[in-house]
Amino acid sequence: MSMKQPVRVAVTGAAGNISYAMLFRIASGEMLGKDQPVILQLLEIAPALDALKGVVMELEDCAFPLLAGVVQTDDATVAFKDVDYALLVGSRPRGPGMERKDLLEANAAIFSAQGKALNDVASRDVKVLVVGNPANTNAVIAQRNAPDLDPRNFTAMTRLDHNRAMAQLAGKTDSTVNDVKKMIIWGNHSSTQYPDLTASTVNGKPALDLVDRAWYEGTYIPEVQQRGAAIIKARGASSAASAANAAIAHVRTWVMGTDENDWVSMGVYSNGEYGIAKGLIYSFPVTCANGDWSIVDGVDVSSDFSKEKMAATEQELSEERDAVAHLLP
């Protein structure tokens, strides 16, 4: 197999748990293909650089044929130099006694700086995935600070919610995730997200014909919305491996394309589709081809139930954006 030229992949929060579950898989070719060498450009805060050094030692010790180089730094302009992909995983976690507004502001500072650095030094075609929470709003902040880059290059991860929703539906219908098609997560990566089965099928049959409405509204939706909290309760730590898996899948789909007759959920820049306010980064059903995404047209969102759920998560995203509006250019 002839090798391509290496591409540069930046990962922030590179010594953290999600990155630890992700970097080895990127270096093995799982994200961009087995014929695509990568240079990893890893960003951490200064106090974590020693821990990062240990991760890099382990990466070296794997002797990955596709790993063409590693950069370790606490300087965003070094980490983002000429990058083709940027996975923004690092964010400020919510500490004791911290209000949501404080969390938004702390992250606004981080993602403003990263957006500016991407604007200054990244490839003009850089594909950005924000994983660090609140992911949708952090993506808006980075995007607004990168006026020279196409807003379509900035995405937020709702693939984890999408995968959770598929797994729960497969379990309920005694099928496998391979049988589930056309899942949708609308809105924010938060407990207001709307896992919508209106268009979904299981083995070609409409999902809503296979499950009862009371289960769908009363059990399924809240379970998908609150799955992250359930994992923290059970594991004593937040989901890391499943988040890393979803991040890899998000980028791989964006680059390699969606399967025929199926789609995925991605937090992407709204241009007013489905009546959602322009400029929000909102999760829509999308198809991907030739390294680009497009929002699926014509999904039926006419029911009062759908309208209400989509508006509630949009309102939360608008409120988050408004809370940091004074920090946006």
Swiss-Prot record:
It comes from the Bacteria. It catalyses: (S)-malate + NAD(+) = oxaloacetate + NADH + H(+). CDD domains: MDH_chloroplast-like. NAD(+) binds at residues 13-19, 107, 114, 131-133. One of its GO terms (molecular function) is L-malate dehydrogenase (NAD+) activity. The active site is at 189 (proton acceptor). This is Malate dehydrogenase. NCBIfam families: MalateDH-SF1, PRK05442.1. It comes from Psychrobacter cryohalolentis (strain ATCC BAA-1226 / DSM 17306 / VKM B-2378 / K5). Its EC number is 1.1.1.37. It is an enzyme of class 1 (oxidoreductase). Gene3D superfamilies: Lactate dehydrogenase/glycoside hydrolase, family 4, C-terminal, NAD(P)-binding Rossmann-like Domain. One of its GO terms (biological process) is malate metabolic process. InterPro entries: L-lactate/malate_DH, Lactate/malate_DH_C, Lactate/malate_DH_N, Lactate_DH/Glyco_Ohase_4_C, Malate_DH_AS, Malate_DH_type2, NAD(P)-bd_dom_sf.
